[in-house]
Amino acid sequence: MLFYRAALPLSSRTLSYLSGILRRHRKTIGTPWRRLNPGQQALLVLVHLRKGETLTEVAAGFGIGIATTWRYIREAVTLLARRSPRLDQALRAAKRAGYPYLVLDGTLIPIEGVAADRPYYSGKHKKHGMNIQVLATPDGTPLWTSGSLPGSVHDLKAARIWGILRRLQAADLVTLADKGYVGAGEHVRVPYKGRDKPASQKAAHAAHAKLRGPGERANAQLQSWRILRKLRSCPLLAGQLVKAILVLQLCEAG
């Protein structure tokens, strides 16, 4: 196997942040000596998540076994996901910030699937995956991500399962969303349906899209972490993985 030097498009701040989390965790649990120190473990995890390199590739690059690599990654992802904001915390923060509205959007994390995995097949995206709900600010900064549900689950149903609609109403926060959320209630504003709309509805539709567009960039930010472009681990871990990446993305953005 050949080796080469490569750049990782992340700041040293993010590396230091994750290293600190791992260092404190090792001290708390009284871990014995490990092959990689906290900084090296943090770098390994960031390479895997950001670049999407396989366990075999990462393990070879850091000179450790595949099983150890997997344990290092799972440990870091679990610790990061615990720091992800809860829905009520995210909504309180949005309220304090005074955002005029939020943006709710669903995304699909692709997984390796076969014909027998029908519950994971998304008719909307025409592929197997896990449904994740994302709340973002008007400028596209992700605020909160949900757990994962099979890809066949409709966005509106997913929003109800995670209690998003009820919490938005309780917080009295207006939220913009696409047509997949028709019927979500008065606090979730969606575009008009149908082709032959009057001029007033067409104008409202265009204004809605203009406001919603920047907010939907939150999903693009999360999926800039290439591990989310096709998940090869257990699909049930998708939600935790996205929450961990949310924490890293917010750290990277400063």
What are these regions (language model features)?
Residues G30-R34, R232-P235:
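Short, surface-exposed loop/turn segments at secondary-structure junctions
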